[in-house]
Amino acid sequence: MPRAVGLETLAEAVRWIRKRRLPVAFPFEYRVVAADDIWMSPMNAGPVASISMHQYERMPWQALFAEAEQLFRAAGGRPHWAKRHTLTRADVDALYPMAERFRAVRRRVDPTGKFLNGHLRELFS
C-alpha cells in the first residue's frame, strides 16, 4: 500500500483484530520499501508500506486473512505473490498495468505451463 497510509492501516488492522478477538500466533512485519520497476512487483507503485501477517498452520486463518486482505486492498495494497490471496485475473489486470505483457513473456518462456499451479494458471495463462 502507499507508504503514506501504512501505519494507519496497520493500526486499523490491530483494532479490528482486538475487537473481534481473532487469534494471532505471530508478530506482524511492517516494512517500508522503495519503488522498483518490476512489472508484477507489489512494490512497483512505491514507495510502499508492506504489512505481512502469518498464522500458525494449525490455527484458524481464514477470518484473519480475509479481513486483512479487504482492509489492505482498500488502502491500495497488493498481496505478495507467495502469500495466500484471493486475486482474480480481473483483479490482476486492474492492479498491474503490465499484466498482459507479463503473460506473453510467460507463455514464451514456459509454453507448457510447467511452472504454473492451478491458481497461477488462472491468473497468468
Which positions does each model-derived feature cover?
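Activity-critical C-terminal alpha-helical subdomain
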Residues: G77-S125
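Substrate-recognition/cap regions that form aromatic- and gly/pro-loop-enriched pockets
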Residues: M1-A94
